[in-house]
Amino acid sequence: MDIAHDLQSIGAQEQALVFPQFDPARAWALGNRMHALATARGHAIAIDIATFGQPLFFAALAGATPDNADWVRRKRNVVAHFRRSSYAIGLRMQQAGATLADKHGLPISEYSPHGGSFPLTVAGAGVIGSITASGLPQRADHEFVVEALCAELGHDYAVLALERS
Protein backbone atom coordinates (compact mmCIF):
# COMPACT_ATOMS: atom_id res chain seq x y z
CA MET A 1 0.00 0.00 0.00
CA ASP A 2 1.33 3.43 -1.01
CA ILE A 3 0.07 5.92 1.59
CA ALA A 4 0.60 8.97 -0.63
CA HIS A 5 -1.33 7.35 -3.48
CA ASP A 6 -4.14 6.28 -1.14
CA LEU A 7 -4.39 9.81 0.28
CA GLN A 8 -4.65 11.20 -3.25
CA SER A 9 -7.35 8.63 -4.11
CA ILE A 10 -9.30 9.36 -0.92
CA GLY A 11 -9.18 13.07 -1.77
CA ALA A 12 -10.70 12.25 -5.16
CA GLN A 13 -13.40 10.15 -3.45
CA GLU A 14 -14.23 13.01 -1.09
CA GLN A 15 -14.45 15.48 -3.99
CA ALA A 16 -16.68 13.22 -6.10
CA LEU A 17 -19.07 11.80 -3.50
CA VAL A 18 -21.19 14.88 -2.87
CA PHE A 19 -24.97 14.93 -2.50
CA PRO A 20 -26.97 17.62 -4.33
CA GLN A 21 -29.20 17.70 -1.24
CA PHE A 22 -29.65 15.49 1.80
CA ASP A 23 -32.51 14.84 4.19
CA PRO A 24 -33.68 12.09 6.55
CA ALA A 25 -35.41 10.22 3.71
CA ARG A 26 -32.14 10.10 1.75
CA ALA A 27 -30.32 8.91 4.88
CA TRP A 28 -32.87 6.13 5.29
CA ALA A 29 -32.51 5.07 1.63
CA LEU A 30 -28.71 5.06 1.85
CA GLY A 31 -28.76 3.21 5.17
CA ASN A 32 -31.06 0.55 3.77
CA ARG A 33 -28.82 0.19 0.70
CA MET A 34 -25.82 -0.31 2.99
CA HIS A 35 -27.76 -2.76 5.17
CA ALA A 36 -28.79 -4.83 2.13
CA LEU A 37 -25.24 -4.85 0.76
CA ALA A 38 -23.77 -5.87 4.12
CA THR A 39 -26.41 -8.56 4.63
CA ALA A 40 -25.81 -10.01 1.16
CA ARG A 41 -22.09 -10.24 1.93
CA GLY A 42 -22.52 -11.60 5.44
CA HIS A 43 -20.75 -8.62 7.04
CA ALA A 44 -21.12 -8.36 10.83
CA ILE A 45 -20.97 -4.57 10.95
CA ALA A 46 -22.57 -1.50 12.45
CA ILE A 47 -23.76 1.23 10.07
CA ASP A 48 -24.37 4.84 11.07
CA ILE A 49 -25.49 7.92 9.17
CA ALA A 50 -25.66 11.20 11.04
CA THR A 51 -25.56 14.92 10.56
CA PHE A 52 -23.54 16.69 13.22
CA GLY A 53 -25.65 16.33 16.34
CA GLN A 54 -28.48 14.28 14.85
CA PRO A 55 -28.56 10.52 14.23
CA LEU A 56 -30.47 9.61 11.05
CA PHE A 57 -29.82 5.88 10.59
CA PHE A 58 -28.22 3.15 12.67
CA ALA A 59 -28.14 -0.61 12.23
CA ALA A 60 -26.12 -3.36 13.85
CA LEU A 61 -26.15 -6.49 11.72
CA ALA A 62 -26.03 -10.03 13.06
CA GLY A 63 -22.66 -10.61 14.67
CA ALA A 64 -21.88 -6.93 15.29
CA THR A 65 -21.05 -6.08 18.89
CA PRO A 66 -21.43 -3.03 21.15
CA ASP A 67 -17.73 -2.44 20.49
CA ASN A 68 -18.58 -1.77 16.83
CA ALA A 69 -21.01 0.96 17.90
CA ASP A 70 -18.26 2.58 19.98
CA TRP A 71 -15.84 2.42 17.03
CA VAL A 72 -18.54 4.12 14.92
CA ARG A 73 -18.80 6.94 17.47
CA ARG A 74 -15.03 7.45 17.65
CA LYS A 75 -14.57 7.36 13.85
CA ARG A 76 -17.52 9.74 13.41
CA ASN A 77 -15.82 12.15 15.84
CA VAL A 78 -12.74 12.21 13.57
CA VAL A 79 -14.87 13.27 10.59
CA ALA A 80 -16.62 15.90 12.73
CA HIS A 81 -13.28 17.32 13.87
CA PHE A 82 -11.34 17.25 10.59
CA ARG A 83 -14.13 17.22 7.96
CA ARG A 84 -12.17 14.44 6.23
CA SER A 85 -12.43 10.67 6.00
CA SER A 86 -11.27 8.91 9.16
CA TYR A 87 -9.08 6.68 6.97
CA ALA A 88 -7.37 9.71 5.40
CA ILE A 89 -6.65 11.14 8.84
CA GLY A 90 -5.29 7.79 10.04
CA LEU A 91 -3.03 7.50 6.99
CA ARG A 92 -1.77 11.05 7.54
CA MET A 93 -0.96 10.19 11.15
CA GLN A 94 0.82 7.02 10.02
CA GLN A 95 2.76 9.01 7.43
CA ALA A 96 3.80 11.54 10.10
CA GLY A 97 4.64 8.84 12.65
CA ALA A 98 2.27 10.53 15.09
CA THR A 99 -1.03 9.95 16.86
CA LEU A 100 -4.06 12.18 17.23
CA ALA A 101 -3.17 12.53 20.91
CA ASP A 102 0.41 13.62 20.10
CA LYS A 103 -0.39 15.96 17.25
CA HIS A 104 -3.83 17.31 18.17
CA GLY A 105 -4.38 16.45 21.84
CA LEU A 106 -7.36 14.25 20.96
CA PRO A 107 -7.88 11.25 23.28
CA ILE A 108 -8.17 7.77 21.76
CA SER A 109 -11.19 7.16 23.97
CA GLU A 110 -13.09 9.71 21.85
CA TYR A 111 -11.33 9.72 18.44
CA SER A 112 -10.35 6.78 16.26
CA PRO A 113 -8.45 7.57 13.04
CA HIS A 114 -9.25 4.22 11.47
CA GLY A 115 -11.02 3.66 8.17
CA GLY A 116 -14.78 3.56 8.00
CA SER A 117 -16.20 7.05 8.49
CA PHE A 118 -16.68 9.22 5.43
CA PRO A 119 -17.75 12.87 5.22
CA LEU A 120 -21.40 13.47 4.36
CA THR A 121 -20.99 16.38 1.97
CA VAL A 122 -23.75 18.44 0.37
CA ALA A 123 -23.10 20.73 -2.61
CA GLY A 124 -23.15 24.36 -1.49
CA ALA A 125 -23.17 23.43 2.21
CA GLY A 126 -19.98 21.40 2.72
CA VAL A 127 -19.54 18.58 5.21
CA ILE A 128 -22.70 18.24 7.32
CA GLY A 129 -22.15 14.82 8.91
CA SER A 130 -20.76 11.35 8.33
CA ILE A 131 -21.51 7.90 6.97
CA THR A 132 -19.78 5.21 9.01
CA ALA A 133 -19.25 1.45 9.03
CA SER A 134 -17.39 -0.63 11.60
CA GLY A 135 -16.69 -4.34 11.82
CA LEU A 136 -14.38 -5.08 8.88
CA PRO A 137 -10.66 -4.31 8.61
CA GLN A 138 -10.31 -0.52 8.37
CA ARG A 139 -9.55 -0.32 4.65
CA ALA A 140 -12.54 -2.58 3.93
CA ASP A 141 -14.80 -0.47 6.18
CA HIS A 142 -13.73 2.62 4.22
CA GLU A 143 -14.27 0.98 0.85
CA PHE A 144 -17.65 -0.44 1.91
CA VAL A 145 -18.88 3.10 2.60
CA VAL A 146 -17.38 4.43 -0.65
CA GLU A 147 -18.96 1.61 -2.67
CA ALA A 148 -22.39 2.32 -1.17
CA LEU A 149 -22.02 6.05 -1.81
CA CYS A 150 -21.03 5.39 -5.42
CA ALA A 151 -24.16 3.28 -5.91
CA GLU A 152 -26.35 5.90 -4.22
CA LEU A 153 -24.90 8.82 -6.20
CA GLY A 154 -24.51 7.06 -9.56
CA HIS A 155 -20.70 6.96 -9.68
CA ASP A 156 -18.64 4.08 -11.05
CA TYR A 157 -17.06 2.45 -8.00
CA ALA A 158 -14.32 0.89 -10.14
CA VAL A 159 -13.11 4.41 -10.98
CA LEU A 160 -13.08 5.64 -7.36
CA ALA A 161 -12.00 2.45 -5.54
CA LEU A 162 -8.65 2.38 -3.78
CA GLU A 163 -6.07 0.17 -5.46
CA ARG A 164 -6.01 -3.34 -4.06
CA SER A 165 -3.05 -3.84 -1.76
UniProtKB/Swiss-Prot annotation:
User: Gene3D superfamilies, alphabetically?
Assistant: Haem-degrading domain
Query: Pfam families in the record, alphabetically?
Result: HbpS-like
Extract the SUPFAM superfamilies matched here. GlcG-like
* Domain of life, per lineage: Bacteria
Q: Which HAMAP family match?
A: UPF0303 (MF_00761)
**Would you identify the family this protein belongs to, as annotated?**
Belongs to the UPF0303 family.
| PANTHER family from the UniProt entry | PTHR28255, UPF0303 PROTEIN YBR137W (PTHR28255:SF1)
The name this protein goes by in its record: UPF0303 protein Bcep1808_1522
Q: Which organism is it from?
A: Burkholderia vietnamiensis (strain G4 / LMG 22486) (Burkholderia cepacia (strain R1808))
